[in-house]
Amino acid sequence: MAKVSFLNKIYNTGPLILLYYLCISEVDTNLEKIFEIFTLNFQIILIYFWILKRPEIMANGHIFLAGLINDVVMGFPLGISSLSYLIIIFVGTYVRNKSVNTTIASDWFTFLVAMIFSNLLFFSLLNNFSDLSFSFSKIGYNMFFTLFTFPIFWLLFNIYQISLVGNRDV
């Protein structure tokens, strides 16, 4: 019995470990170097899904700390990614509290809203408080590929949730 409980704890921390790994490893930057225009903000997809389905797996403090780590690794001013992730948490929490039954279509639409506000805050703060330059075409590609890969990761995370974590939605 204790062995099963221990395995469940490991499976429950899987998304959190993946979030920290993604923030430390610069996977997004490496994908952009391999594929010319393919860039993906996988952290936002991960945070949004698990805040909607199982918020106790990813606490707000962990997400904020992961944002700080991401800022240090990527060379952004400290706190910009964290604030962007907190916007994702805010929209996800609002949707979770106001909806009775979530579907992939409703999650996808609300993810678009969350991503727009999150990126708007991120790039306006980055533009006003740093000397880093960015092109709007890269932002557009990032939003496009993140939005259209969301259903794929939604299905993969649902399979992970049903098979390993448990099917209990909030």
Show where each model-derived region lies:
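Terminal, non-globular segments
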Residues: 1-170
